[in-house]
């Protein structure tokens, strides 16, 4: 017997969960017909479509709003909650003994990588990584003030230095979040006219190219391509971010740790944020190790610190040191790649495209990707990076831009 299809609900039907449904079904909690089919497949033991319940959960999460009279409606992003619960709990469990510490500190990066590839495959924005970074920084600073400072091994100047480093890192992060510089239709029209006038001139100099962030040969015409998604003619080295849904000027990559793209307007500030974080992290790790393992050198104390598990407070600090080392190591790798790319005048997007098209080559164990398109030498590449045009920088930052 063929099952009768689910009929659309009446407007006054109080039992329907859909509410008002428009043509795109953007105001419904779920698709009743899809949910009915999913339940029937579940009762029959048949494999379900993978996106049915994920879309239902995502749509329910999107509809959980928090009203605020000053900043307007804010959506409640559920991905910010797990780091606030898991980080303190897992680190305190890992501090019980050495075996638990090894297991948890090994599994935690693997879980983060798995979640990254899951969200990267779905091309969706998430606040999980930004929440993880900010809460880890705040929790490490909290333990530093409550566990290390009362021991009396840290001077007031060292506390002020560590606090200043953390504040400078947060300020630099806020400036990085102001925007990567998106391609805009009005400014693009002005840019096309300026480019056409420049192409008519045969006296094109390198200094002009460096100031505009575009390197090409003398008298060479700019190649402008139309974005198939935005339907905008984008300037050279711009790229479309499928996560942000916009074209970014001189796009480098979409960084999940700041939940934003890195482009022409914030690339320098992004590298500065990484540098400040690394310096502050290394300094904080050295202060903690000197306090809990005063008789050992810094490198020896990380591997061998006698009696560190005799007290739970010292064991917790030692576990947090290793947690900080793991995070710092990952960001140090990112920082080194950024320095190499700037030195070669290549963005991460251009490097990936060159490798995919087999037009670039790897050197030095894959750290360097040579494309041969924009490099003018080490010194000139850095001059271009430090003086490139910032006319397309984002507007002033507001509270909603932080997420």
Swiss-Prot record:
Its main location: Golgi. Residues 92, 147-153, 290-319 are lumenal. The active site is at 255 (s-palmitoyl cysteine intermediate). GO terms for cellular component: Golgi membrane. It is found in: Golgi apparatus membrane; Golgi apparatus, trans-Golgi network membrane. The DHHC domain is required for palmitoyltransferase activity. This is Palmitoyltransferase ZDHHC23-A. The lineage of its organism: Eukaryota, Metazoa, Chordata, Craniata, Vertebrata.
């Amino acid at each position: 017997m063929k099952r009768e299809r689910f009929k659309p609900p009446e407007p006054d039907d109080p039992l329907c969960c859909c509410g008002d449904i428009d043509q795109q079904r953007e105001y419904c909690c779920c698709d009743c017909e899809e949910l009915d089919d999913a339940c029937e497949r579940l009762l029959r033991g048949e494999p379900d479509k993978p996106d049915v319940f994920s879309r239902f959960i995502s749509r329910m999460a999107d509809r959980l709003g928090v009203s605020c009279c000053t900043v307007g409606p804010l959506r409640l992003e559920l991905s910010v909650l797990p780091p606030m619960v898991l980080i303190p709990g897992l680190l305190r469990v890992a501090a019980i003994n050495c075996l638990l510490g090894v297991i948890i500190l090994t599994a935690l990066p693997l879980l983060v990588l798995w979640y990254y590839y899951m969200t990267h495959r779905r091309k969706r924005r998430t606040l999980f990584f930004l929440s993880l970074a900010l809460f880890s920084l705040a929790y490490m600073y909290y333990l530093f003030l409550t566990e290390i400072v009362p021991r009396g091994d840290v001077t007031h100047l060292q506390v002020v230095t560590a606090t200043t480093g953390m504040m400078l890192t947060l300020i630099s992060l806020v400036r990085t979040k102001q925007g990567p510089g998106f391609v805009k239709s009005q400014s693009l029209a002005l840019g096309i006219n300026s480019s056409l006038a420049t192409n008519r001139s045969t006296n094109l100099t390198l200094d002009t190219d460096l100031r505009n962030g575009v390197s090409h040969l003398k008298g060479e015409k700019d190649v402008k391509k139309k974005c198939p998604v935005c339907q905008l003619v984008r300037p050279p080295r711009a790229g479309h971010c499928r996560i942000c849904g916009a074209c970014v000027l001189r796009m480098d990559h979409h960084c999940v740790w700041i939940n934003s793209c890195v482009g022409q307007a914030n690339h320098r500030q992004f590298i500065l944020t990484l540098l400040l974080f690394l310096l502050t992290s290394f300094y904080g790790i050295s202060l903690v190790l000197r306090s809990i393992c005063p008789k050992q050198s810094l490198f020896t104390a990380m591997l061998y610190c006698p009696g560190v598990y005799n007290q739970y407070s010292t064991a917790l600090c030692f576990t947090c040191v290793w947690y900080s080392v793991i995070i710092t190591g990952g960001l140090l790798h990112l920082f080194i790649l950024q320095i190499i790319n700037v030195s070669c005048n290549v963005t991460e997007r251009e490097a990936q495209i060159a490798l995919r098209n087999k037009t670039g080559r790897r050197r030095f164990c894959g750290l360097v990707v040579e494309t041969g398109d924009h490099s003018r030498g080490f010194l000139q590449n850095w001059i271009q990076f430090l003086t490139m045009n910032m006319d397309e920088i984002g507007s002033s930052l507001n509270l909603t831009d932080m997420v």
